[in-house]
Amino acid sequence: MGKCRGLRTARKLRDHRREQKWHDKQYKKAHLGTALKANPFGGASHAKGIVLEKVGVEAKQPNSAIRKCVRVQLIKNGKKITAFVPNDGCLNFIEENDEVLVAGFGRKGHAVGDIPGVRFKVVKVANVSLLALYKGKKERPRS
């Protein structure tokens, strides 16, 4: 049996569409509000946090590496997240209790590549771009 056609079927068509919307994954995620609640950033693109510790995360098979990450406690809500530190040797610019700016890591809230469970990356350390520190354009401010 197909959809209703003809006169006086608008209400039924509208109601059916309204019900069926909720079976669409993207629509449900956008409109339920639970994804926003679960998101540590609370809908924002970036968030500041304090570095708790440096951690090494083992890469998934078939790769073999220890990816350099940091545990960060967000200032806005106190949630703890793991953030990836990009580029070679950039972990040396970060110390415990530093203030870092953290951004998403691509893939809309999913882990990227071979790094399991890491959904964020470090962008700035002590209000200085990590890329500028890496390239030697800027130095870490003395604290």
Swiss-Prot record:
The GO terms this record gives for MF are: structural constituent of ribosome
Q: What CDD domains is this protein classified in?
A: Ribosomal_S23
Location within or outside the cell: Cytoplasm, Cytosol; Cytoplasm; Rough endoplasmic reticulum
CC terms in the record's Gene Ontology section: cytosolic small ribosomal subunit; rough endoplasmic reticulum
Renumbered residue ranges of the record's region Disordered: 1-27
Keyword check for Magnesium: no
Q: Where is the composition biased (Basic and acidic residues)?
A: 16-27
Single Gene Ontology BP annotation: cytoplasmic translation
- Provide this UniProt record's keywords sorted from A to Z: Cytoplasm, Endoplasmic reticulum, Ribonucleoprotein, Ribosomal protein
The record's section on Pfam families has: Ribosom_S12_S23
Has keyword Nucleotidyltransferase?
Answer: no
Give the primary localization class. Answer: cytoplasm
The record's annotation in PANTHER family points to: 30S RIBOSOMAL PROTEIN S12 FAMILY MEMBER
Q: Tell me, how does this one assemble? A: Component of the 40S small ribosomal subunit.
Similarity annotation: Belongs to the universal ribosomal protein uS12 family.
This protein is called Small ribosomal subunit protein uS12
- What species is given as this protein's source? Ictalurus punctatus (Channel catfish)
Gene expressing this chain: rps23
